[in-house]
Swiss-Prot record:
It comes from Callithrix jacchus (White-tufted-ear marmoset). This is Glutathione peroxidase 2. One of its GO terms (molecular function) is phospholipid-hydroperoxide glutathione peroxidase activity. Catalyzes the reduction of hydroperoxides in a glutathione-dependent manner thus regulating cellular redox homeostasis. Can reduce small soluble hydroperoxides such as H2O2, cumene hydroperoxide and tert-butyl hydroperoxide, as well as several fatty acid-derived hydroperoxides. Cannot reduce phosphatidycholine hydroperoxide. It holds the Pfam family GSHPx.
Length: 190
């Protein structure tokens, strides 16, 4: 079993440009973490909605995208290729993320990123689909398999301004529909 951090603020990641992203700097802001893939059927929808949320709450929300290849190999780009894939292929049209993308990682299994080990421990299943599991067991390419595993691309985790994981959302929950929960956490009028 992977090491599980004691606090959200003990975690970190490495951005696509190689810089350390220290979660301790997120104190006082809500954080939305989403495992992403540039070749998924909902890539365009989810990436544009992530940009929209980041733009709506520029100083009070941090959005982090974690590219992952564990679901249908739908993030088969290397780290240095991901931004060009998003810009020219999907969503395309010159798309540029307004949020931070970190280096490609695993979200399940023996080599899962510590961020996902922590989040899955605190939020073991999506609130909107507590029975969410991988729909086709032949697609599972990691071990060990756990009930709390991320089921597919674009699962989301919302963390409150005090660093407490608040809610986990399934792959089918539209990213933009998280806005009322973000407002609630930030005490913004809905």
């Amino acid at each position: 079993m992977a090491f599980i951090a004691k606090s959200f603020y003990d975690l970190s990641a490495i951005s696509l440009d190689g810089e350390k992203v220290d979660f301790n700097t997120f104190r006082g802001r809500a954080v939305l973490i989403e495992n992403v893939a540039s070749l998924u059927g909902t890539t365009t929808r989810d990436f544009t909605q992530l940009n929209e949320l980041q733009c709506r709450f520029p100083r009070r929300l941090v959005v982090l995208g974690f590219p992952c290849h564990q679901f249908g190999h739908q993030e088969n780009c290397q780290n240095e290729e991901i931004l060009n894939s998003l810009k020219y292929v999907r969503p395309g049209g010159g798309y540029q993320p307004t949020f931070t993308l970190v280096q490609k990682c695993e979200v399940n299994g023996q080599n899962e990123h510590p961020v996902f080990a922590y989040l899955k421990d605190k939020l073991p299943y999506p609130h909107d689909d507590p029975f969410s599991l991988m729909t086709d067991p032949k697609l599972i390419i990691w071990s060990p398999v756990r009930r709390s595993d991320v089921a597919w691309n674009f699962e989301k985790f919302l963390i409150g301004p005090e660093g407490e994981p608040f809610r986990r959302y399934s792959r089918t929950f539209p990213t933009i529909n998280i806005e009322p929960d973000i407002k609630r956490l930030l005490n913004v009028a809905i």
